[in-house]
Amino acid sequence: MPGISARGLSHEGRKQLAVNLTRVLALYRSILDAYIIEFFTDNLWDTLPCSWQEALDGLKPPQLATMLLGMPGEGEVVRYRSVWPLTLLALKSTACALAFTRMPGFQTPSEFLENPSQSSRLTAPFRKHVRPKKQHEIRRLGELVKKLSDFTGCTQVVDVGSGQGHLSRFMALGLGLMVKSIEGDQRLVERAQRLDQELLQALEKEEKRNPQVVQTSPRHSPHHVVRWVDPTALCEELLLPLENPCQGRARLLLTGLHACGDLSVALLRHFSCCPEVVALASVGCCYMKLSDPGGYPLSQWVAGLPGYELPYRLREGACHALEEYAERLQKAGPGLRTHCYRAALETVIRRARPELRRPGVQGIPRVHELKIEEYVQRGLQRVGLDPQLPLNLAALQAHVAQENRVVAFFSLALLLAPLVETLILLDRLLYLQEQGFHAELLPIFSPELSPRNLVLVATKMPLGQALSVLETEDS
C-alpha cells in the first residue's frame, strides 16, 4: 500500500498533513467509531451510502483485498466489475495518500527464505528462544541503534520496557554496545538474566570451535534493572550511567521496541527534558492504552486543531495489521467468518440482556468448524448466559449469509486505520520539532512480519545524510 514519507515533508508540510488528517477522520468517523460486533445490532451496513453498498455487496474477500485495500495477489491485474462511485474511490485514494508509507527503503531478499523460523542474518545463538518476528525486529532495530549511537557519540543505550531482553542482549553481546535494560516485571528480568548467561556460554563454545574468530573487546552483558517507568515523572534510574564516562557527562540513547501505550510517551519526555539523552529510537504500539489526556495529543499544533480527538475505538483500530488481513482476504479462508459469528452472537445477547453490550468472549477454538448455533451456545456460556436459550435459527442463518458484507465493512475500517496511526505518530514528530529537536519516522521492519514498523528517530543535532544510512540494511 503506497503512502507518504515523513522525510519528504517540511515542518510546514507536516503541519498541513495534520490538518488534512483531522478533516478526513472527522468525515469518516462513523466507520472508524463502529464496532464490527455490532454489525447487525446497529445495522452498520445501512449506514453506508447506497452507492457504496451496491459497489461492495457481493465482493469476495480476494476482490476486497485487491480493489479496496489495493493489495492484489502476486501477478494479479486489478479489474473492477463495475464503475465505483467517486466518493468511494476518493476514500481509497485519500487513505493511501495521507498515511505514512510502511514500506522500508531497503529491498533485500527475505532473511527467512531458507527457513521460515530462522533468520539467515542472525547467528544461531541469537536466534535461540526468539520467534521469527522478534528475530527480524531485534536485528533491524539493533543495527539502527548501533549506527545512531555511533553518529551521536553515545556512551550508553537504555532499552526501556525490555521484556525478556532479546533486543538488549543482541545490542550488548552482538553489537558491542553498553546497554542498560529497564523492565518492570521481576519475572521477565529474571528470565532475561538466565538467557544472558545461556547466550554467553553459547558464544564461548562457538569461539572454542572457531579459534580464528577473535573477540577483540570484552563482552558486557546488559545491566538489568527492575523498575516501572512512570510516564508522568522523570526516572532517575534511567539516567544513571553504568560507568563513569571518560570525559564529561554520559551521553544516552533511549530505545524501546514496541513500548506500550504511555511508555513511548515517557521516552519522548525523557529525551526532551534531559540533557544527558542525546538520541532516541522508539517503536510504539498499543495506542489504545494512551492516557487521554496526557498521551495524545503532545504537540501544541495538533491540540489546536478542530477534530483532533481520537477516542479509544479509533486508537484501538490503529493497532490492526493491514497487510496480514489483506493476505487473509486473498486466501479467503474460513477464519474470516469469526467477525460475522461474533456479530450474530451479539444479537442473541442483546435480546437476552439488553443492558449487556459488547461483553468480552474468550477465544472459542476452531470457530470455522462450528455451526452458527454451536458457536452461539458456547459464546452464551462464556458471557454467563444460559447456553440453552431458544434460538431463532432462521435469523442466525440470515446473518451468516451476510458474511461478505461484514468482511467488507471491516475492510473499510481497516483501510482508514493507518490514518489514525499516522496522526498519532505525526503528533509526536511535531512535539519534538516544536522544541527544536530533529525527528524523523522511518519504516524499518517488513510490515508483513511486524505491523507497527515505524521507528521514531530523534536527535539534538542534525543528522543530514546519516538518516539514509540508518534505513539501509547491513551487509
UniProtKB/Swiss-Prot annotation:
InterPro entries assigned: Methyltranfer_dom (IPR025714), METTL25 (IPR052220), rRNA_Ade_Mease_Trfase_CS (IPR020596), SAM-dependent_MTases_sf (IPR029063)
Keyword flag Membrane: yes
Key words, A-Z: Coiled coil, Membrane, Transmembrane, Transmembrane helix
Cell location: Membrane
Xref: SUPFAM superfamilies: S-adenosyl-L-methionine-dependent methyltransferases
Domain of life: Eukaryota
Any Pfam family hit: Methyltransf_32
Gene Ontology cellular-component annotations: membrane
Coiled-coil parts of chain: 186-210
Membrane topology: Single-pass membrane protein
Main location: membrane
Transmembrane segments: 406-426
Molecular functions per Gene Ontology: rRNA (adenine-N6,N6-)-dimethyltransferase activity
Similarity comment: family membership: Belongs to the METTL25 family.
Protein name (database record): Methyltransferase-like protein 25B
Organism: Homo sapiens (Human)
Lineage: Eukaryota, Metazoa, Chordata, Craniata, Vertebrata
Record gene name: METTL25B
